[in-house]
């Protein structure tokens, strides 16, 4: 199987996470997407809801969407959510499957600052979500890596055996949604219905999350 992996704080999970994941799933013909909430994000100190609440919100989204599953291995880990550690664990859990780690271009351009970043290519393929027409600047430190490892969707369609170490770029529809914006709206008593799945909004309202 081809398995996509999308990690995040998901505080809360919203369409800005879900729609790009669905577009990647369709473009790369992935069988499944693992939605993976972080427990202790390396670059963030606090969250606005508990780990249990974020897990429940993601679990409910996965129940509502076909081909999405909750992955709680980072949430259960009592250490920082370093991607290389997670991918090693997932490689052991899915030894016969092909893993596709999904990230935005804003994360990819800073990939060299990640913990043991070069080992990521030994464990999975990297999927970089980008806005249509956007290109990495010539001379950028990650340009060589992108050029050397870039693979086309056509090459993927002719691939049968699981592989890793390739970079796929997928154009996605712009999503003007952020968790920060949603939390601010809720704190002011506004209901961001267009940004959240109904099941997520219902859970937030029942739990009184993010309300002042």
Swiss-Prot record:
Domain of life: Bacteria
Enzyme type, top EC level: transferase
Pathway involvement of the protein, from the record: Cofactor biosynthesis; NAD(+) biosynthesis; deamido-NAD(+) from nicotinate D-ribonucleotide: step 1/1
Catalytic activity of the protein: nicotinate beta-D-ribonucleotide + ATP + H(+) = deamido-NAD(+) + diphosphate
Keywords of this entry: ATP-binding, NAD, Nucleotide-binding, Nucleotidyltransferase, Pyridine nucleotide biosynthesis, Transferase
Pfam families assigned: CTP_transf_like
A GO BP annotation: NAD biosynthetic process
EC number: 2.7.7.18
PANTHER family: NICOTINATE-NUCLEOTIDE ADENYLYLTRANSFERASE-RELATED (PTHR39321), PHOSPHOPANTETHEINE ADENYLYLTRANSFERASE (PTHR39321:SF3)
Family the entry assigns: Belongs to the NadD family.
Known role: Catalyzes the reversible adenylation of nicotinate mononucleotide (NaMN) to nicotinic acid adenine dinucleotide (NaAD).
NCBIfam families, per database record: cyt_tran_rel (TIGR00125), nicotinate (nicotinamide) nucleotide adenylyltransferase (TIGR00482), PRK00071.1-1 (NF000839), PRK00071.1-3 (NF000840)
Name by which UniProt lists this protein: Probable nicotinate-nucleotide adenylyltransferase
Species name: Shewanella sp. (strain MR-4)
Lineage: Bacteria, Pseudomonadati, Pseudomonadota, Gammaproteobacteria, Alteromonadales
């Amino acid at each position: 199987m081809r398995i996509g992996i999308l990690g995040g704080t998901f505080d809360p999970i919203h369409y800005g996470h879900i729609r790009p994941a669905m577009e990647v799933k369709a473009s790369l013909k992935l069988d499944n997407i693992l939605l993976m909430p972080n427990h202790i994000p390396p670059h963030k100190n606090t969250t606005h809801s508990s780990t249990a609440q974020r897990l429940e919100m993601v679990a409910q989204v996965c129940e509502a969407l076909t081909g999405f599953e909750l992955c709680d291995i980072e949430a259960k880990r009592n250490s920082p959510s370093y991607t290389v550690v997670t991918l090693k664990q997932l490689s052991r859990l899915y030894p016969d499957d092909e893993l596709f780690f999904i990230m935005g271009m804003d994360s990819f351009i800073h990939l060299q600052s990640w913990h043991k970043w070069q080992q990521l290519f030994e464990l999975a393929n990297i999927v970089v979500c980008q806005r249509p027409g956007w290109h990495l600047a010539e001379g950028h430190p990650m340009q060589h890596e992108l050029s050397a490892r870039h693979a086309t969707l056509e090459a993927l369609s002719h691939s049968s055996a699981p592989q890793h170490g390739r970079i796929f770029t997928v154009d996605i529809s712009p999503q003007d949604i952020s968790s920060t914006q949603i939390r601010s709206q809720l704190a002011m008593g506004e209901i961001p219905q267009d940004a959240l799945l109904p099941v997520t909004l219902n859970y937030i309202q029942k739990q009184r999350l993010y309300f002042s």
